[in-house]
């Protein structure tokens, strides 16, 4: 198996009391977490987010990105829905790791955008791997997702892995003066849909 289930516990948060499920990735030893709320194994599409770790945004309140605000918005949305899943993947810096992310930030301080910085360091613009998502969702009995993301490439990547994405739910939040170039680059070079004109996209049944 690509991932091994370790344990589950309660996780009280300001938004709701989630169940926290821990997994270890067999090939790398990375530890991943899934938060779930309500009955997600009833066969109906589940509101969910696949969120890659961002220490600076999620824990240190960085305004260089929109990651922390997206994480909070996703947890709030799941709590409001009363049902959902959040996959928290340990793929810092779109897969390049924390120290390389800081190196990329240094290049961005000198004028590079987020894609150019990755490429100057010898990395692809996005090095994340979503193959581990399917077995974690299968463990929880999730058959279909209403995926909170602005990234159509993420939808395609998950679909290519055999995950049924019934709908893309936009997640527009966290814009500020410090991340305007970052968000513009995600839209222009990484294909993210950042505008309000795309309210939702329903995929094939």
Curated annotation (Swiss-Prot):
Positions contributing to Zn(2+) binding: 54, 65, 67
Active-site feature positions: 126, 128
Superkingdom in the source lineage: Bacteria
Pfam families given in the database record: GTP_cyclohydro2
Keyword Membrane appears in the UniProt entry: no
Gene Ontology biological process terms, A to Z: riboflavin biosynthetic process
EC number: 3.5.4.25
Residues that span the membrane, as ranges: none
Co-factor note (free text): Binds 1 zinc ion per subunit.
Enzyme class, first EC level, given as a word: hydrolase
A single GO cellular-component term on record: cytosol
Cofactor(s) in the UniProt record: Zn(2+)
Catalytic activity: GTP + 4 H2O = 2,5-diamino-6-hydroxy-4-(5-phosphoribosylamino)-pyrimidine + formate + 2 phosphate + 3 H(+)
Entry binding sites for GTP: 49-53, 70, 92-94, 114, 149, 154
Family: Belongs to the GTP cyclohydrolase II family.
Physiological role: Catalyzes the conversion of GTP to 2,5-diamino-6-ribosylamino-4(3H)-pyrimidinone 5'-phosphate (DARP), formate and pyrophosphate.
Protein's name in the database: GTP cyclohydrolase-2
Lineage, top ranks: Bacteria, Pseudomonadati, Pseudomonadota, Gammaproteobacteria, Pseudomonadales
